[in-house]
Amino acid sequence: MKTQALKGMRDLLPAEQTLRDYIQGKILETYRSAGFERISTPMLEDMENLDKSEGGDNLNLIFKVLKRGDKLTAALNTGDPKQLSDMGLRYDLTLPLSRYYAANKDKLPNPFKVIQTDRVFRAERPQKGRLREFVQCDIDILGDASPNAEVELIDVTTRALLNIGFTGFTVNINDRRILRGMLESMGFAADTLDSVCITFDTMDKIGAEGVKAELTEKQLPESAIQALADFIAAGDVTLDAVAARCADPAIANDLKYVLATANTLAAGRYQVAYCPSLVRGQGYYTGMVFEVTCPQFSGAVAGGGRYDNMVGKFLGVQVPAVGFSIGFERVCGILLEQGYQIPGAKQKIALLYGKDTDFPAVLSKAAALREQYNVTVLPQGKKLGKQLGQLEAAGFAGAAFMDKDEVKIFAQQ
């Protein structure tokens, strides 16, 4: 029998789980203080729903569940691999929420402000920062088409990050419609815009020349590629410059409103910036998109955007929707590396008792000590020094004894 967890999945030791519980609790507390309500959905979704969810590259990372019994036999006989699975593990929480809302719309308030903190699964190639099973902490607003929904999500999410001790971050914001409008005005065909956007999204990593080379490899119009290269080279990738190439000024006005309002709410505690190359990988985003980044860490710690077409796939009627997700695993990992300590947490001690000690008396003393400490009751070992060393190594702050009033705190030795 193998003792190791599967690749890309993790066992958690008590100290890390305690920190995760605290962080998730603070995030939930912040979300709930803003009137958001928590729901839960199944981990498994219908494969047809998953396949039609426009999840970008995530659609290639779905853990699929084989059909069973006669249905599997019949599927094997077709010779079509797509017939083998009828359900799969969710790769994020947006598709399940959209299905949930469509099924329960008449029972829910409008707009619906919702929390989801749950596990999702992706068949990633395991590496640092890439797990196959991980937790997402999402808030979404369904039923509000105004840019105030984006402002509220940014405000609540950033307050959650601040409340768990996260500082020095930047909220980057863009609108896919403005970027697409600019690219179309340069001569890129509408059916190539998604591909162009994905390449443009990597500009901060590969530079302007890298973007030009990658678009050339895709055999896109040379004149359009050169127009984009000239625009980037001019150093004029400002919101006003990009918006000037977009046919609908209302889109740019909404983005300016969100940027200005979010910056006011930040009050200097974090930065808010327009990021012209920000796209986000999921194909279901339809408007504004946002990411939270920290200069000292690579990659985003939170991200989201507007997905006005997703619920309509179930209802046949468009429902405005926008969400923001905190990368829980990433945030926990960063705080662990920084040696984060839970504010105001009680110290953990062990109350040691002898073999002949009256056990109800042990529990009574433990109850009294719990006014000040988190107390575990343990039988005292034959080699007390060794036992105390093991307790300290396991994260205990000290030990108490039945025949002594004081608590022995290890750091004070």
Where are these regions (language model features)?
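Charged, compositionally biased N-terminal leader segments and the immediate start
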Residues: 1-4, 183, 188, 195
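TRNA-binding/sensing appendages of the translation machinery
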Residues: 1-91, 95, 103, 151, ...
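Positively charged, Gly/Ser-enriched RNA/tRNA-binding surfaces
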Residues: 19-36, 45-46, 81-84, 92-106, ...
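Short Asp/Glu-rich motifs
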Residues: 50-51, 180, 202, 387
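Short, structured secondary-structure boundary patches
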Residues: 51-66, 190-194, 292-295, 396-402
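Short glycine/threonine-rich loop-to-helix capping motif typified by GTGT followed
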Residues: 54, 180-190, 283-290, 337
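Acidic, His- and aromatic-enriched active-site or binding-groove loops in soluble protein domains
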Residues: 58-74, 187-211
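Glycine-rich, mobile lid/loop segments that gate access to catalytic sites or pores
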Residues: 170-181
